[in-house]
Amino acid sequence: MADRRRTDDNKGAREVVLLLNIGSPDSPEVKDVARYLNSFLTDRRIITLPFLLRQLLVRGIITPFRKKSSAQKYRTVWDESTRSFPLISHTKAIARALAHTGRDVHVAMRYGKPTVADVLKELPHGRSLVVLPLFPHYAMSSYETAVEHCKAEIRRLCPNLSFRVVQPFYAHEAYIRVLADNIRPYLTKPFDKLILSYHGIPRDHLDKTTRQALDLRHPEGCCTEEDPTANVCYRYQTYRTTALIREALCLAEEQVEQVFQSRVGHTEWLRPYLIERLSAWPQEETKRILIACPSFVCDCLESLEEVADHGQSIFKKAGGADFTYIPCLNSGANWIDALRNILEE
């Protein structure tokens, strides 16, 4: 494929910033959702089966079975005025806000549009690239697949491009500070517990990245800060984020609980499961909860439909009294400042 990138006479120009996010379907129409599911689920870092078996499973069973129900869920978060999904709109808003600070900022999605190739083809010659994956924690199904796909596209289209990739920022002071600032105003109302819900991953994904046989519990001594596997252990990184948020908010351990959401299929994922705890909390006299989703920097299907809508319904049907969803960071001014700090390190 021909390289149609523009030329740029200024060889010392500043870095171009590429924001990477996971992506969304083109629309909530069944055909677009089916196309997105096929692209997403046939990624070997999502479903780790051999190629042919993975293709048969996804295209022959999963997508035909799930496309209509998934499309119905996507319709609940579709914005007709912008003809876009929140994840796309918020990511583009982040890019615009960062651009106002004097940076050249572009957006690409791992699945869907705009693609990494779209950005690379328009990248001016003589510019270097800084890739900022909008995933605070390392997981093979989010950070790793986005970064490795981006690297592969760079090798294919721009083999001489100078670039760097920002590491997961799960413990970065600026990220923790803005998360705490986002949550703090909600603590003024009476509550029984702050829930921090992270996107779950299959246990075998964790085993593949850490190369350890892990128990259902996070084993003592696994992935300490000094352990070299900590930089790829999703479970360690999420618990570290939780601990730092709790400390920043000056909350006691019993006031904060971490859970994992979005499990699909019948394999074992990281526990505890949000879906189970939602029904259990009211029985434990935890009837007023605040819930935030730190693994999502932008509101999306999983935060809005799964947690804020469906999660609230489950909680209240089980006897819960007050369910308060705390929106993601999205494109707030403090988050933009935090991203500037993360980019500059």
Swiss-Prot record:
Entry keyword set: Cytoplasm, Heme biosynthesis, Iron, Lyase, Metal-binding, Porphyrin biosynthesis
Which reactions are catalysed by this chain? Answer: heme b + 2 H(+) = protoporphyrin IX + Fe(2+)
Query: Which residues make up the binding site for Fe cation?
Result: H199, E302
Question: Where in or outside the cell is it found?
Answer: Cytoplasm
Q: Could you confirm whether the keyword Repressor appears in this record?
A: no
Question: Signal peptide: which range, if any?
Answer: none
InterPro entries per the UniProt record, alphabetical: Ferrochelatase, Ferrochelatase_C, Ferrochelatase_N
Pathway given in the UniProt record: Porphyrin-containing compound metabolism; protoheme biosynthesis; protoheme from protoporphyrin-IX: step 1/1
Its BP terms in the Gene Ontology are: heme biosynthetic process
Matching Pfam families: Ferrochelatase
Q: Which residues form a coiled coil?
A: none
Q: Where does it mainly reside?
A: cytoplasm
GO CC aspect terms = cytoplasm
EC number, UniProt record: 4.98.1.1
What is a GO molecular function of this protein? ferrochelatase activity
Q: What does this protein do?
A: Catalyzes the ferrous insertion into protoporphyrin IX.
* Family in the record: Belongs to the ferrochelatase family.
The protein in question is named: Ferrochelatase
